[in-house]
Amino acid sequence: MAVSKFVQIRRDLHKIPEIGFKEWKTQQYILDYIGTLSNEHVEVKVWRTGVIVKVKGKNPEKVIGYRADIDGLPITEETGYEFASVHEGMMHACGHDLHTTIGLGLLTAAVTERIDDDLVFLFQPAEEGPGGALPMLESEELKEWKPNIILGLHIAPEYPVGTIATKEGLLFANTSELYVDLKGKGGHAAYPHTANDMIVAASHLVTQLQSVISRNVNPLDSAVITIGKITGGTVQNIIAEKSRLEGTIRTLSVESMSRVKSRIEAIVAGIEASFQCEAVIDYGAMYHQVYNHEALTREFMQFVSEQTDMKVITCTEAMTGEDFGYMLQEIPGFMFWLGVNSEYGLHHAKLRPDEEAIEKAIVFLDQYVKWKGTRK
């Protein structure tokens, strides 16, 4: 059965997931598609592995921005799709193929029927890490076209197609990666008294970290520390000289993030003293909370509820991390969840979003942008 133009675009993109700042094929695909739309009203800039596109308005008073993240994840796909990833060990497991497709659909509509205001589309690399939103925001390429209003979306497997979910104010958490490297003294398993076991040190550290949230953060102010990976040792009869812990920190307030990091540093210092080892902490990529502009979000929710076919749900904040939060620090705007009704969740190897959501999103966002960017 033939599929629609934009479903096919999504499938094309799904085949070529690429990690942050290496999205060369994705960038070229976007540029090639934009080339089919180009006219005197369309301007294109390349920023690293991303693309910035401006559609000139007929009588602009402001700039409306749409941001789509374009990178994939280092996950081996298990969807069974005929159009599964052709890049081994890589997958679009967070819906960025849909985000990008919806952006191209909205761009197509904008070129076909121009509005009064300027539109800027940000096809942003590296959302999954190391973070592309902040450097794109600070780039010379964007300064001239910086939006006055910006919006973004994220697919939501748990919501049905035809539904969006968002809220005023805090939507997504502050997030930080966490890496701790421990170094002691290795040795033979038969002579533990001559060595300094970093497997044991790492085990104690993981256990002690469990008290950081439960005893240092207000229970009404949610926070999470997860250690997702521990490595150490080389063979079963050698005491490990080194170990490494990798995890994530998520909080719903900046104050809690600061407090949690302070406690982690104190506990790691205690591990150093207790086990006579060296420890190095690296917080890796850190993302600012996604905080929706109250008035714009309220207006958007009302418009979608009253003037489109989409159902609007007021959701609660989530511990999800998104570097779009940096853009919302500087530009009034909002992010929302788009229902795609998948049995499997984000970052799962079997994530299968319902493609019907693509056309629905393009249609209702085009309605909103035309309403917001046209003089009444």
UniProtKB/Swiss-Prot annotation:
Alphabetized InterPro entries for the sequence: AcetylDAP_deacetylase, Amidohydrolase, Bact_exopeptidase_dim_dom, Peptidase_M20, Peptidase_M20_dimer
Biological-process GO terms, alphabetical: diaminopimelate biosynthetic process; lysine biosynthetic process via diaminopimelate
HAMAP family: DapEL
Protein name, UniProt field: N-acetyldiaminopimelate deacetylase
Organism expressing this protein natively: Bacillus anthracis
Active site (catalytic residues): 69, 128
Keyword line: Amino-acid biosynthesis, Diaminopimelate biosynthesis, Hydrolase, Lysine biosynthesis
EC number: 3.5.1.47
Function noted in UniProt: Catalyzes the conversion of N-acetyl-diaminopimelate to diaminopimelate and acetate.
Biological or metabolic pathway of the protein: Amino-acid biosynthesis; L-lysine biosynthesis via DAP pathway; LL-2,6-diaminopimelate from (S)-tetrahydrodipicolinate (acetylase route): step 3/3
Classification of source organism: Bacteria, Bacillati, Bacillota, Bacilli, Bacillales
CDD domains documented for this protein: M20_Acy1_YkuR-like
